[in-house]
A protein has these predicted regions:
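N-terminal ligand-binding/catalytic initiation module
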Residues: 8-13, 31, 42-44, 49-350
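Short acidic, glycine/serine/threonine-rich loops at helix termini
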Residues: 221-223, 244-255, 286-293, 337-343, ...
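Short acidic (Asp/Glu) and glycine-rich catalytic loops that position anionic groups and cofactors
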Residues: 95, 241-243, 463-465, 542-550
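Rossmann-like adenosine-cofactor binding region
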Residues: 442-532
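N-terminal chloroplast transit peptides
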Residues: 1-27
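Adenosine-phosphate binding glycine-rich loop
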Residues: 109-110, 353-357, 370-373, 492, ...
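Glycine-rich phosphate/diphosphate-binding loop of Rossmann-like nucleotide-binding domains
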Residues: 347, 352-466
Length: 567
């Protein structure tokens, strides 16, 4: 029998080992599949089964027709979990409706060389595979050796992409076994380069593509993937603000894919029950628009009413097609990210990772740093260099946390200082700042005579406890800026967070050198230790998987600010 079992292990979040594993010894619980709905009448019926742990579902006992994750209609009988189950998954078996090339081309079911001889006979695979049967461990050894032959991170990213679209069990098992090495390959910082080169390195489509020129097709396109109980988690992006590298058009689907890979690795959501969605509304990236190989719409980004109507239809379609799914907004531009979150967060369980996820993980790091140095959050002054979605999310999360600890909101906002390309945000900038930025604007009179465009001068006057960088301005935290901060702060807390790595405001080695190893540093991408000091990583992958998992398990109807703070 075909025995490909996917199970979820729960382990310490700090080690990122909630991940997909494989086993071939699970007891079977069958989900019969009606073959006639999948193939013509001359397709032979198989009694062999595929076993796997399936993500937690409501306890359905009735028979119903749904679409499978491979896009075909099938009749399933769902078995209820144990009465007091709090686990994400339910063990069981399903009959596999696929055979031959169709089975080998389904990444959710394909086992490659691990199909047993019995399975090869039952599923018409004998002529399609070499005779030797491999274990998963042998497949892992072969795959890792192939990976090690590759010299560049981007080449390794290509290899992992190819593996993901062939065999998801092997893909997740390989990452789990080499997680410290491979997360930077499948996620930041390497994924940014893969996104930028998407149309040139394209191999096989993944996810759902929604075209703003065909808004009436949204519901039909979403329904291509499955039915109302087939999807737990959706990541959607319009690709305007990708990972610090800006507008990447159709390539933004890759950020949704990589986020969902982490949802499986760290949150335990089944890879067949997640959905990456790309909203193609055009691109303002002139390089992409001139590229004859670019695969998306080449017209300029559509904004205004047409854009809003398109988003409205998308939200309504999600609520109708996948009513229980959590919606994760990812890498929208600064003009749209916050307003879309505020508009739709109470219509369906949704959150914006750039705003709320970033804020949560930075808040956690700040709390840890203050605790380490015996300082109080109420006395903390934070200077955020970069006032986009991430910077504002960090500011809001710090303020919310202060408020929950008894600080007046107005007083809390006075302790947050924002800088953008014009310098420190002042009240006179109201016409050129967003409402979310303006609540942190400082009085022009208080800053009269000070060069508010100079980071050094602002640091000299603010005397920040914590300096946060999300500006994508490489090298912005210069030696004189850091030394000025260190004059007033014996243990400066410095978070250069911009991604990819080449856009970091400073590298940890310099920060430690300029502060005589006194700085408390956390970065947005992984860095090696400095003089024996381990560099912490302020990455969203430490926040959104747990938040998403909690929302899926609880069937939350709204993701509140208190839930973000708890995360």
């Amino acid at each position: 029998m075909l025995r490909t079992r996917l199970s979820v292990s729960v382990a310490a979040r700090s080690q990122l080992t909630r991940s997909l594993t494989a086993s071939r010894t699970a007891p079977l619980r069958r989900w019969p599949i009606q073959q006639s709905r999948l193939y013509s009448s001359n397709t032979r019926s198989h009694k062999a089964t595929t076993t796997r742990e399936n993500t937690f579902q409501k306890p359905y006992s009735d028979e119903e027709v749904t679409k499978t994750p491979v896009g075909s209609r099938a009749r399933k009988i769902f078995e209820a979990p144990h009465p007091h189950a709090t686990r994400l998954t339910v063990e069981g078996a399903i009959e596999c409706p696929l055979e031959s090339f169709q089975l080998l081309n389904s990444p959710l079911f394909n086992k490659g060389s691990a199909f047993t001889q019995e399975e090869r006979e039952a599923f018409n695979l004998e002529a399609l595979l070499p005779p030797q049967v491999n274990t998963l461990d042998e497949q892992l050894e072969r795959s890792y050796k192939q990976l090690c032959y590759l010299k560049t991170p981007l080449a390794k990213n290509d290899f992992m992409t190819s593996l993901r679209v062939q065999n998801k069990v092997l893909y997740f098992a390989l990452i789990r076994k080499h997680i410290k090495e491979l997360v930077p390959i499948i996620y930041t910082p390497t994924e940014g380069d893969a996104i930028a080169a998407y149309s040139h390195r394209f191999r096989k489509p993944e996810g759902v593509f929604l075209d703003i020129t065909e808004p009436d097709s949204i519901e039909r396109r979403l329904a291509t993937y499955g039915g109302d109980k087939d999807v737990d988690y959706i990541v959607v992006s319009d690709s305007e603000g990708i990972l610090g590298i800006g507008d990447q058009g159709i390539g933004g689907v890759r950020i949704a894919i990589s986020k969902l890979a982490l949802m499986t690795l760290c949150g335990g959501i089944h890879p067949g029950r997640v959905l990456p969605v790309c909203l193609d509304v055009g691109t303002n990236n002139k390089k992409l628009a001139r590229d004859e190989l670019y695969m998306g719409n080449k017209f300029s980004r559509i904004r205004g009413k047409q854009y809003d109507d398109f988003l409205e239809k998308f939200i309504k379609a999600v609520k109708k097609v996948y009513p229980s799914a959590v919606l994760h907004f990812e890498d929208f531009g600064v003009k749209n990210a916050r307003r879309l979150l505020e508009k739709y967060r109470y219509e369906l369980p949704s959150f914006n990772d750039d705003i709320q996820g970033t804020g949560a993980v930075v808040m956690a790091s700040l709390i840890a740093a203050l605790k380490h140095t015996n300082r109080d959050l109420k006395d903390t002054r934070v200077l955020i260099y970069g006032a986009g979605s991430a910077g504002l999310g960090i500011a809001d999360q710090i303020v919310n946390h202060m408020v929950t600890h008894g600080v007046d909101k107005g007083e809390a906002r006075k302790k947050i200082f924002l800088m953008d390309r014009r310098g420190l945000i002042l009240q006179s900038y109201e016409a050129n700042s967003t409402p979310a930025q303006h609540v942190y604007a400082k009085s022009d009179a208080e800053w009269a005579g000070i060069n508010t465009r100079s980071l050094h001068d602002v640091v000299e006057n603010v005397k920040p406890t914590c300096l946060v960088g999300c500006s994508t301005q490489a090298g912005a935290f210069t030696q004189d800026v850091v030394e000025e901060m260190h004059k007033h702060n014996p243990r400066p807390i410095i978070f250069p967070l911009s991604n990819p790595t080449r856009l970091h405001e400073a590298v940890p080695a310099d920060l430690m050198k300029w502060t005589n190893n006194n700085a408390l540093v956390a970065t947005g991408s992984p860095f090696p230790p400095v003089d024996g000091y381990r560099i912490s990583e302020n990455n969203n992958c430490y926040s959104f998987p747990g938040l998403g998992l909690g929302a899926v398990l609880s069937r939350a109807t709204t993701i509140t600010d208190k839930m973000i703070s708890a995360a």
